[in-house]
């Protein structure tokens, strides 16, 4: 066999093997979108919980959602009512939340019949709701356990069964409002001017700048 041909074959085979190894070692980049979607479906036990306090204004009743001492839930509370103050805890780093009354400590949950009920223990998936911001700037709250079922109230403020709700219905539309007298941040403070002492270098710089002026 011709030595040149043998050398060419050897080099070709060597390059071919290197190409195969490179194809095996190269991995596809991680799909971050899929990771977020999967993690949003489970309770996040590691991240720090974000806690917010606000009222839920019902579009249909014109009143606010409240959780009473007897665990009943309705949308008949006036602005600033003690039972209308809600504590909202994030369940994942997505938009899933748990809602409980600040006065009673009961969580808003949904049973298998689609009825809103109050529970002292809100760890179940039936007490988790997904916040959906709609095009009209209202927010819909879909139950995490019963997909397609929403928190809803009638014009009289009575809870409506989740099995009879749809996202486009006015009964499922809410607006977040801060309780009366609740401030998100501290009052603005006036600016304080500090007397910064000049050192030798700053004095020299100031004098040189003054000498350069016409």
Swiss-Prot record:
Keywords: Developmental protein, Differentiation, Glycoprotein, Growth factor, Mitogen, Secreted, Signal. Glycans are attached at residues 31, 137, 207. GO terms for molecular function: growth factor activity; type 1 fibroblast growth factor receptor binding; type 2 fibroblast growth factor receptor binding. Its main location: secreted. GO terms for cellular component: cytoplasm; extracellular space. Plays an important role in the regulation of embryonic development, cell proliferation, cell differentiation and cell migration. Involved in initiation, outgrowth and patterning of the limbs. This is Fibroblast growth factor 8. It comes from Gallus gallus. The lineage of its organism: Eukaryota, Metazoa, Chordata, Craniata, Vertebrata. The gene is FGF8.
């Amino acid at each position: 066999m011709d030595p040149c041909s043998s050398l060419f074959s050897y080099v070709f085979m060597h390059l071919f093997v290197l190409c195969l190894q490179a194809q095996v070692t190269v991995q596809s980049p991680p799909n971050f979108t899929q990771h977020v979607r999967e993690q949003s479906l489970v309770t996040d036990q590691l991240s720090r919980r974000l806690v917010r306090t606000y009222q839920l204004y019902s579009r249909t009743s014109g009143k606010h959602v409240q959780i009473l001492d007897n665990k009943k839930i309705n949308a008949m509370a006036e602005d600033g009512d003690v039972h209308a103050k809600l504590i909202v805890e994030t369940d994942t780093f997505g938009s899933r939340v748990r809602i409980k009354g600040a006065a009673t400590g009961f969580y808003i949950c949904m049973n298998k019949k689609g009825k809103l009920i109050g529970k002292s223990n809100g760890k179940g998936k039936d007490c988790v709701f997904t916040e959906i911001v709609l095009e009209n700037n209202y927010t819909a709250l879909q139950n995490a356990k019963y997909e397609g079922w929403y928190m809803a109230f009638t014009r009289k403020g009575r809870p409506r069964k989740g099995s009879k709700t749809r996202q486009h219905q006015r009964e499922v539309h809410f607006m977040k409002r801060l309780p009366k007298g609740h401030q998100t941040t501290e009052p603005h403070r006036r600016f304080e001017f500090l007397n910064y002492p000049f050192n030798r270098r700053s004095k020299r710089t100031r004098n040189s700048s003054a000498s350069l002026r016409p």
